[in-house]
A protein has these predicted regions:
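C-terminal helical subdomain
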Residues: 113, 117-121, 138-183
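Active-site helix of classical SDR
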Residues: 56, 92
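The beta1-alpha1 cofactor-binding region of Rossmann-like NAD(H)/NADP(H)-dependent oxidoreductases
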Residues: 1-6, 38
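Substrate-binding pocket helix/loop in short-chain dehydrogenase/reductase
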Residues: 32-33, 40-42
Length: 183
């Protein structure tokens, strides 16, 4: 049993149901695509795509059985628009967008499971250390010098907004970014 499956089993045992999954998985070791850092690519796909799939797979039997639930996928603005050095990362976050839409089509009306894809821009977390340690460090630091980023609480508040919407509706996508983020 995986850690995710164990967590779902413990939650089911304690509460008898799973109402919400916040599916947040991400790593971003940025590098130019021509560097061919294939092990980094594989790791990003494993964490950013397969990690999300494992979360879905773990809660799905419970949500299907109870005829309700809400899966919140934490994607990225990069899933809409790649950036230099982040091509593979952007591809993984585009996969999260595609999964979200597909889940909505398969699980929404037929099974009462809502799906929301939240796509944050820059959030002040350790995720960006992968960029800051790579060949883009100086450009990244200069681009963000003196600028405000989202706080993790901003993303949490966005999740709360989505999951507290009326049961008859679904907030399908939310793009949130700092005011200081141009793209």
């Amino acid at each position: 049993m995986s850690d995710v499956e164990a967590l779902v089993a413990a939650t089911n045992k304690e509460f008898g149901r799973i109402d919400i999954l916040v599916n947040n998985a991400g790593t971003m070791p940025a590098s130019p695509i021509i560097d061919r850092r294939i092990s980094d690519w594989k790791h990003m796909v494993d964490v950013n795509v397969n990690g999300v799939l494992h979360g879905i797979g773990a809660v799905l039997p419970t949500m299907l059985g109870q005829g309700s639930g809400h899966i919140v996928m934490i994607g990225s603005i990069a899933g809409r628009r790649p950036f230099p050095g982040g091509t593979v990362y952007a591809a993984t976050k585009f996969a999260v967008r595609a999964l979200s839409w597909g889940l909505h089509l398969e699980l929404g009306a037929a099974h009462g499971i809502r799906v929301t894809d939240i796509q944050p821009g820059q959030v002040a977390t350790e995720l960006y250390e992968g960029v800051r340690q790579g060949p883009y460090k100086d450009a990244w630091d200069k681009a963000w010098e003196g600028k405000r980023r989202l706080k993790p609480q901003d993303v949490a508040d966005t999740v709360l907004f989505a999951v507290t919407s009326p049961e008859h509706m679904v907030v399908s996508e939310l793009l949130v970014r700092p005011l200081d983020q141009a793209n």
